[in-house]
Amino acid sequence: MKFKYGATLFSGFLGLSAILAACGAKGKFDQVDDGKIVLASSLTSKNAANALQAVVEKYNQVKGGNDYPIEITQITGGYDGGRGNLQTKLSVKDKTTFYNLI
């Protein structure tokens, strides 16, 4: 009974250590702090895009002096275009033109 408990406990720690090793900082990168928040949008509906633009404009008008302004960048191709763009920017570790929110 002790052997089974010990083996189960050991295998749990082994699995946990593998997960922690996979989550290491090897692939990490930081963006350049450019003083703004870039919001990527892949909205295909003009009404939805206009509504998002109105919300961002209102936020930029009422934000505090220490808060970053928000800019919207449009990603073409809908959700598929957004996914492809995100994968590309992550794989090349784009530090300067990468967006902060999607």
From Swiss-Prot:
Primary location class: membrane
**Localization, UniProt:** Cell membrane
Question: Which GO cellular component terms, listed alphabetically, does the Swiss-Prot or TrEMBL entry include?
Answer: plasma membrane
S-diacylglycerol cysteine lipidation sites on this chain? 23
Q: Which UniProt keywords apply?
A: Cell membrane, Lipoprotein, Membrane, Palmitate, Signal
The signal sequence is 1-22
As for membrane topology, the entry says: Lipid-anchor
Renumbered to this chain, the positions carrying a covalent lipid of the kind N-palmitoyl cysteine are 23
Family under the similarity heading: Belongs to the MG185/MG260 family.
Question: What protein name applies here?
Answer: Uncharacterized lipoprotein MPN_363
Instruction: Report the source organism.
Output: Mycoplasma pneumoniae (strain ATCC 29342 / M129 / Subtype 1)
Q: Give the classification, highest ranks.
A: Bacteria, Bacillati, Mycoplasmatota, Mycoplasmoidales, Mycoplasmoidaceae
